[in-house]
């Protein structure tokens, strides 16, 4: 029996074992692909490929079950699993029972393929625990920033794949939840659009969303020369303003500790730091991206 925390976001699936893959599935294998696949019933799904599927209620997405079972198969050989899963703070009270009833006690007969090896699996989800997204990840790493928090209430800003969830955290309790339809995907798309419309690159290069983070981290090269794309990256600032205006109007950002986390923390971190003195940006992608999943397991 294994216990796993699985964070199924709109952009990526993360697990408590430090595994991550894109929240995409397709029934048509891409040429030359070496992606893992999972067969459920008479359908085979290739993980991490295809198009994103966006739904405010994540567990109602058609790709939810292939992503969940795929994450289980990728991370444990055990047949019986206990799972920790998350819901947005605003949905937690109303939907947690539905999520538990959807999965708890269910059995799934699947075939999982990695490379040239295919295994038949009979997976039983013995139990489901649900947790509020963002808050759980923050509490998991709170010990690392306890001196910066200094006993204050916390305004938590969790920038996910397609939404930003905000809540006021007092002790271990979250109140005043609010969700904005701005996330990492929107940020990447804004930068992508700016690059595509830039006359320097027009018609010369194909810009792919999945490469945007590499361009930010490693630079954008054309014909062997590194290009200055600061203004293109700054095209996402208007999205920051949507989040900032909500914080400024409805949360005690001048007296509380403001903590930004999630996949978009690194992307918008500098903009936050310029506008909110003393803000804590949890932007260590290799570490903090797994915060929710690790908190769900704990």
Which residues fall in each region the model found?
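Nucleotide/phosphate-binding catalytic cleft detector across ATP-hydrolyzing
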Residues: 1-154, 173-186, 207-298
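Long, well-ordered mid-to-C-terminal structural blocks that present hydrophobic/aromatic surfaces
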Residues: 168, 172, 190-192
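Flexible, glycine/charged-enriched surface loops at secondary-structure junctions
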Residues: 204
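Short, acidic (Asp/Glu-rich) active-site segment that either coordinates a divalent metal cofactor
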Residues: 156, 163-168, 179
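Short amphipathic alpha-helical segments with coiled-coil-like heptad repeat character
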Residues: 94, 200-201
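Long, charge-rich alpha-helical interaction segments
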Residues: 193, 197-200
